[in-house]
């Protein structure tokens, strides 16, 4: 299966990449900066590393069209005041990119939330979950 892995430079993304390769998948890793991405030489023939910015919809054209599944592990986690807006826009662009594709499943890594007292970061993750949930693909959060 050809799987899109966003957040491939993060803690979970790096570890998930190896597991997905071990199970025989071809992985398309999207990163903001290729210089921050490293992988064992033994798996380089099973992955594609593509530099994209999910805030720039045009840059998503670099991603292959035949994606069959995806892991959405991106989180801004920046300290800027507008990170919630940026995360929402990234999720919308991801969802729009997936339109018309034969995607079997998307997995989104959110956070454990308490509806009564959400931090700004967890509130942002809930917003992303909502936006991704509007897509035409099955979503697991």
Each model region followed by its residue ranges:
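N-terminal Rossmann NAD(P)H-binding glycine-rich loop of SDR-like oxidoreductase domains
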Residues: 1-30
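NAD(P)H-binding glycine-rich loop region in Rossmannoid oxidoreductase-like domains
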Residues: 4, 35-101, 113-115
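SDR active-site strand-loop-helix element
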Residues: 6, 30, 73, 106-111
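Hydrophobic residues within alpha-helices
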Residues: 12-16, 94, 128
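General small-molecule cofactor/ligand-binding pocket signal
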Residues: 28, 48-50, 140
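A short helix->loop->beta-strand "cap" motif at the edges of active sites that frequently abuts
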Residues: 100-105, 136-137
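Conserved beta-loop-beta element that borders a ligand/cofactor-binding pocket
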Residues: 110, 130-141
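Conserved catalytic-site region of short-chain dehydrogenase/reductase
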Residues: 112-123
């Amino acid at each position: 299966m050809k799987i899109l892995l966003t957040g491939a430079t993060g803690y979970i993304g790096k570890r998930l990449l190896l597991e997905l390769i071990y199970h025989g998948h071809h992985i398309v890793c999207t990163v903001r900066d290729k210089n921050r991405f490293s992988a064992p030489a033994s798996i380089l023939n099973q992955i594609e590393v593509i530099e994209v910015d999910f805030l720039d919809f045009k840059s998503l054209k670099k991603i292959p069209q035949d994606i069959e599944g995806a892991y959405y592990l991106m989180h801004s986690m920046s300290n800027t005041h507008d990170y919630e807006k940026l995360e929402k826009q990234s999720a919308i662009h991801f969802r729009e990119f997936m339109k018309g594709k034969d995607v079997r499943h998307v997995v989104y890594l959110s956070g454990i939330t308490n509806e009564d007292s959400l931090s700004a970061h967890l509130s942002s993750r809930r917003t992303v979950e909502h936006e991704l949930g509007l897509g035409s693909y099955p979503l697991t959060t």
